[in-house]
Amino acid sequence: MMHRIDRRTFIRRTVQTAIAAAAGGLPVLDLLSMPAQAGQAPPLAVRKGQDIPLLVRETISALDGMENFVKPGDVVVVKPNIGWDRTVELAANTHPEVVKALVQLCLEAGAKQVRIFDRTCNDERRCYMQSGIRPAVESIRSDRVSIEYIDRRSFKELAINGGRAFDRWEFYLPVIEADRLINVPVAKHHSISRLTLAMKNLMGVIGGNRGRLHHNIAESLSDIASVIHSDLTVVDATRILTANGPQGGRLQDVRKLDTLIASPDIVAADAYASTLFGLSPEQVPTVVAAARRGLGVMDLKQVRMV
């Protein structure tokens, strides 16, 4: 059995205190940047297969099952990339079958509620439909599952203690207040950050002018990840976008790998995913910056393959 630091309860309580303080005219409470647990090699599961529901189950089973991450009564956010008005085969968004299978595992583990959302780049209604994610989630037909558009009234500005690029930003309260966050990016090339993986997928749960983050993208994403803790990261590499990311649009830029990567360590997951593009983790600035901040393990020799 793996032992993890559960930061969700900590973050939820500090945010609630911060909001109460702000309402009373006091300064917003700093959210402490919490480093990864020292002295333990984080587990990393990598599996291949063309049957996506089975692939998801086998990958999560290697991490002791979804029950290791989701407890009965938990409110869970499953955060895929739904940012683009692109169809499944173009690899701009997380594969809908990956999302559906993860949601089903959360329900089987006893989740009280599973919420799926993303702050899209293109029109949200088209993104949710064209990606195939809305139809896939709705096909589960459970009143414990909801796929939602972002409610822009639910962003709150919070201070980032020790921020390198920013000392405060707007965060989406439903993801902060959830008991568990499952971060489910698709692996893609990115014209600015080189790759867009789990770290960058967190941009879908922040407010404000996200373009400002691109001026110092590596440190900006580390700032965000120091506040938003992913309890489980699942990188969709069933097909990857090798060029012209993040939006893509050409089938010749897509490579089918039938691969899934999962870990409770967001940095380790991104580090391994970078190798699928022929890169070492040291060549991906977002991975390097996060590892230096103590947000996870970049050296793949220090992870425990399961």
Residue map of PLM features:
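N-terminal and secondary-structure boundary signal
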Residues: 2-306
